[in-house]
């Protein structure tokens, strides 16, 4: 049964669909009808109605939040199923989210460590080096002088992921039932794949184990260096890794 909170969120999704005139995406579902009603009652809210479908879809997913952005990123890789112009637009989606406050990161790290940060780190930068939908990264220096980066899960991210996945699954079932092209895209399977990806991202110990295995696989390789994990300070919610300086892979000029 759909709860009131979910109904309110679905209404918000319908509003975004109306904003970008994407009502037809959900075909004959009640959500599409609600989006058309919103577009009719508040036509001034419609944006980018002359833009190509792919661009409107990208902007809508961006508005709907980080979990929907990840769904769009995953869809962009399905070039065997999506038209090239839509796949190209979705590939432009970036997992960019404003960082949460440094004091919250400190609290999360201390909770995981079971001791004050000052007992483990001689330095801990409150300003995040990078921030994404599931976690963010802080620079730090261990008490022994080693430079490290500390990855911290966002407060409450587990509950938010569960809520959004429930909604996305509802939408996938709607699309699967009413959209004639659903058999090619297989939306329910796609959401299950997204859920698996997010489940892995919510467990930093699993990520650390994968990184350690990768390091073992490339031991002695002169072309690739994988940073070391500091297992004494790595938990499900917090991961500490050797800091390595380099050039971003997308910096072609460098």
Regions found by a protein language model. Name each.
Residues 1-136, 144, 160-187:
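N-terminal accessory/targeting segments that precede structured cores
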Residues 72, 137, 150, 207, ...:
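Residue-level signature of catalytic and energy-coupling elements of molecular machines
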Residues 128-130, 141, 230-232:
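Well-ordered beta-strand positions
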């Amino acid at each position: 049964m759909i709860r009131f909170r979910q109904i309110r969120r679905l209404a918000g999704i319908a509003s975004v669909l109306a904003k970008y005139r994407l009502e037809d995406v959900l075909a004959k579902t009640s959500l599409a009808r609600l989006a058309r009603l919103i577009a009719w009652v508040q036509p001034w809210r419609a944006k980018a109605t002359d833009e190509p479908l792919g661009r409107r879809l990208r902007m809508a997913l961006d508005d709907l939040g980080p979990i929907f952005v990840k769904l769009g990123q995953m869809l962009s890789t399905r070039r065997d199923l999506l038209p090239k112009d839509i796949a190209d637009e979705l590939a432009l989606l970036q997992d960019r989210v404003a960082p949460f406050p440094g004091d919250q990161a400190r609290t999360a790290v201390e909770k995981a460590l079971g001791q004050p940060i000052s007992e483990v780190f001689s330095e801990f930068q409150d300003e995040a080096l990078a921030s994404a939908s599931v976690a963010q990264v802080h620079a730090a220096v261990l008490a022994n002088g080693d430079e490290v980066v500390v990855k911290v899960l966002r407060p409450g991210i587990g509950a938010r992921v569960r809520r959004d996945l429930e909604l996305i699954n509802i939408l996938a079932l709607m699309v699967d039932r009413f959209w004639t092209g659903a058999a090619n895209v297989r939306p329910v399977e796609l959401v299950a794949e997204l859920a698996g990806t997010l489940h892995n991202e919510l467990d930093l110990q699993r990520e650390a184990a994968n990184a350690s295995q990768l390091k073992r696989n490339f031991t002695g390789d002169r072309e690739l260096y994988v940073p070391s994990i500091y297992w004494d300070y790595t938990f499900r919610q917090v991961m500490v890794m050797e800091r390595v300086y380099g050039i971003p892979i997308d910096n072609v000029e460098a």
